[in-house]
């Protein structure tokens, strides 16, 4: 009898195992699932950012999709990036005049004007999604008047990407550095000559990550050496270029404080999309830590963030803490399978979602959103 109870209990636990989802079931399989694998639906059938992942997963060769999708280790940080937002309930405010919310969306980053507080993150190898690679991303960002940050490991050279900019379009350039300052100088000079207005230094990848999913398909990390990323190196790099450095990969309040002390103009809270160190915190958790222990940082420097953002409500939680703009990575790479039209649609989907979610939250001016719009007591959903 006792053994039967134990077996029954174990079976109950197994049947109650938590789901592991990339996207929710919104009926897309029922409506579009008859399409042959390896083909694409109409881009107008994409209604949310997660729809682009569904399309890319069915369309791309497994190796290509895996490169974009993979995370480090057991992929807990990848999953946590997606799920952390819903651990904090929103607090909608009613009887608010929100009719000017769309007009409040434009923002600045390092003094440059953009149409909305979100941007396309640096992601490597856009050529895995489409032959035109990063050209689609730069043109899609230009059409939407948002920031695009090409990766150091782009399929195409920065010169070719920059040549496709719209008039007055602003680009920043991500840089991975190494201990060869001759190579670093060439990298900085190329970005500057191509017209980049800032260097986004990836400081969270000093070693090679453990990406088992990527290794399985032969698409491991582009980084394979140990690199010296220190404040002393930052001081040296500043003598090598006129461009400002944004530090991408800040994951603790202590490092955010040091960035302020070292007069860094902006930081990006990021765990590299869960691709570098499994167990690293999400950008929302980092922003919460900063807000609780040193909220003045959000006034002292510009704080950006990326990781797991799929919905307008995700971005609103980050903006409520003081984050100035929110980065989107994988969904934009998935949208690239449709070419420039896919990127344009992804940008507009997210813009519309962010604007309408802000209105439904009772935010009259996106720049005035604050912590009162979120219940910051975690509900422990999937924690």
Where are the predicted features?
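Fungal secretory targeting signals
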Residues: 1-18
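A gly/proline- and charged-residue-enriched helix-loop-helix capping module
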Residues: 143-183
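Alpha/beta enzyme core
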Residues: 139, 164-167, 179-305, 312-336, ...
């Amino acid at each position: 009898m006792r053994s039967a109870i134990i077996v029954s209990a174990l079976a109950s636990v197994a049947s109650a195992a938590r789901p592991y989802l990339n996207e929710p079931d919104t009926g897309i399989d029922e409506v579009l699932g008859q399409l042959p694998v390896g083909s694409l639906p109409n881009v107008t059938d994409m209604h949310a950012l997660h729809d682009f992942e569904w399309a890319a997963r069915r369309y791309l060769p497994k190796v290509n999709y895996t490169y974009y999708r993979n995370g480090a280790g057991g992929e807990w940080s990848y999953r946590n990036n997606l799920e952390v937002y819903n651990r904090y309930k929103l607090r909608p405010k009613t009887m608010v005049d929100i009719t000017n919310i769309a007009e409040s969306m434009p923002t600045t980053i390092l003094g440059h004007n953009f149409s909305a507080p979100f941007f396309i993150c640096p992601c490597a190898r856009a050529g895995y999604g489409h032959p035109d690679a990063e050209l689609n991303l730069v043109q899609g960002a230009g059409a939407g008047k948002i920031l695009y940050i090409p990766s150091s490991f782009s399929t195409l050279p920065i010169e070719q990407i920059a040549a496709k900019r719209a008039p007055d379009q602003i680009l920043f350039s991500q840089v991975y550095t190494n201990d060869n300052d001759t190579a670093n100088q060439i990298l900085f000079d190329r970005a500057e000559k191509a017209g980049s207005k800032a260097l986004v230094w990836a400081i969270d990848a000093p070693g090679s990550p453990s990406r088992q999913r990527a290794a399985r398909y032969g698409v491991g990390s582009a980084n394979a050496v140990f690199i010296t990323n220190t404040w002393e190196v930052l001081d040296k790099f500043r003598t090598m270029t006129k461009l400002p450095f944004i530090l991408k990969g800040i994951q603790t309040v202590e490092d955010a404080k040091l960035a302020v002390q070292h007069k860094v103009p902006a930081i990006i809270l990021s765990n590299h999309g869960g691709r570098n160190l499994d167990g690293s915190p999400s950008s929302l958790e980092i922003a919460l830590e900063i807000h609780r222990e040193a909220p003045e940082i959000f006034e002292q420097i510009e704080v950006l963030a990326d990781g797991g953002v799929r919905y307008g409500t995700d971005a609103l939680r980050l903006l409520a803490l003081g984050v100035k703009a929110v980065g989107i990575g994988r969904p934009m790479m998935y949208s690239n399978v449709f070419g420039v039209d896919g990127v344009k649609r992804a940008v507009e989907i997210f813009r519309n979602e962010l604007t309408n979610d802000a209105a439904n939250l009772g935010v009259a001016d996106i720049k005035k959103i604050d912590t009162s719009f979120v219940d910051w007591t975690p509900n422990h959903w999937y924690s």
